[in-house]
Amino acid sequence: MRPADTWKDYELLDATDGNRLERWGETLLIRPDPQVVWKTPKQSPLWAKADAIYHRSNQGGGEWEYRRRLPEKWKISCGEGEDKLTLIVSPTGFKHTGVFPEQAVNWAWYQQKIRAANRPVKVLNLFGYTGGATLACAAAGATVCHVDASKGIVAWGKDNAAASGLADKPIRWLVDDCAKFVAREKRRGN
């Protein structure tokens, strides 16, 4: 297993009893995580200082409890130099923040493979979400087709591209159902 250790602005501080304590820039968030099945004593005194806590609802979904006023969105950075990405964080109604920080190790791997190819590389990113993988590939020189079914999420991805200085890179942003998109492209011979 390779850790996602290229983050300057994100840190998993502690995890226990179904929850994660994370630092997103200067903001501390507590979010539920079903993979955190152990019940150990909380190791960090920062649990009590969290800026916001996401509470799941028994009916599905949930809501954020804000302990202090937070901006609607803020930026964090991952990587350095030509690999640096600036991503917009915004707590959503379904516990996510717009970034899956554990994916940074995959983004770095994509970049290494794209740069080592010594030829033009095209990437199809299905279910592209807010574009972390898309931007990593574009920063490494790939031409990217980013597909997600949510118009708002694709707009967020474009905002991330602008924040990262990658708005002019060859990225095709598509709002479409991924399965239908692939079926259409297959029929077209692409």
Language-model features, listed with the residues they occupy:
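N-terminal accessory targeting/assembly segments
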Residues: 1-4
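Non-catalytic substrate-recognition/targeting regions of SAM-dependent transferases
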Residues: 6-22, 29-101, 108
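Conserved alpha-helix/loop element of class I SAM-dependent methyltransferases that forms part
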Residues: 101-118
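Conserved class I S-adenosyl-L-methionine
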Residues: 119-129
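A generic structural signal for alpha->beta connector loops
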Residues: 120, 141, 168-170
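Conserved SAM-binding loop of SAM-dependent methyltransferases across substrates and taxa
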Residues: 130-142
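Conserved SAM-binding motif I beta-strand of class I
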Residues: 143-148
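S-adenosyl-L-methionine
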Residues: 150-190
